[in-house]
Amino acid sequence: MSEALANMPGDDYFRQPPVFDTYAEHRAYLKFRHAVALRHFARLGFDQDGLAGLITVADPEHADTYWANPLAHPFSTITPADLIRVDGDSAETVEGQRRVNIAAFNIHAEIHRARPDVQAVIHLHTVYGRAFSAFARKLPPLTQDACPFFEDHEVFDDFTGLVLAKDDGRRIAKQLRGHKAILLKNHGLVTVGETLDAAAWWFTLLDTCCHVQLLADAAGKPEEIPAEVARLTGRQLGSHLLGWNSYQPLHEAALARDPDLATMEPALPS
């Protein structure tokens, strides 16, 4: 097993997230990627549930404020200029003209507060994520793609309606602990990432894994990957750098589909 890890390419094999000299440059980059991620999820049909669905990204300069997609704005038309910056304590908009989905934000703000390592939190109402969450069980290591979540996700099994109290958000954040994802019983999926791109990849992948699991369970009794192998594969594929890199083709495909958004891309540091 140690040889399998030793044979993995080092970090220098992969593309690296950019580093910025100024807060303004970093903020422009994050807001653009934020809008592109929402367009990506729109293509997957993850924006078809009315007011539901939120991506928050920590502002690089202003502590405890988060960029968010505004309530009731379609993902498929969003631009960086549409995003709002929201105070983590009051949930008031401090930059922009719209309001945030307060129930979703109560989850996100508490996760950000409990996990300062997390740049982004994603919670969307997907068909397969909601269906699998109804079983209130962890995702088994059924395929290679599920292994990044092996021993790296949790289940919150206390659905009590809309998350309108901060304490409910705190309980979810506490249950998440240091993991990259949590399944909310009867509700859906939440993923986090040290980068927005990693969080977006984990969310895309987790929903796909839920779909695969539901299909396999319906067909019979699938054979899971042994724990030792699942643990190794998770270490091989589950890093945030791998998550960031895995998302890059999806980001680039979203830009190719939406040339209007591509024209808004800020210049990267040289």
UniProtKB/Swiss-Prot annotation:
Its EC number is 4.1.-.-. Pathway: Antibiotic biosynthesis; novobiocin biosynthesis. Pfam families: Aldolase_II (PF00596). Gene3D superfamilies: Class II aldolase/adducin N-terminal domain. Keywords: Antibiotic biosynthesis, Lyase. GO terms for biological process: antibiotic biosynthetic process. GO terms for cellular component: cytoskeleton. One of its GO terms (molecular function) is actin filament binding. SMART domains: Aldolase_II. It is an enzyme of class 4 (lyase). PANTHER family: ADDUCIN (PTHR10672), PROTEIN HU-LI TAI SHAO (PTHR10672:SF3). Belongs to the aldolase class II family. May mediate the 2 consecutive oxidative decarboxylation steps in the biosynthesis of the prenylated hydroxybenzoic acid moiety of novobiocin, an aminocoumarin family antibiotic that targets bacterial DNA gyrases. This is Decarboxylase NovR. The lineage of its organism: Bacteria, Bacillati, Actinomycetota, Actinomycetes, Kitasatosporales. The gene is novR.
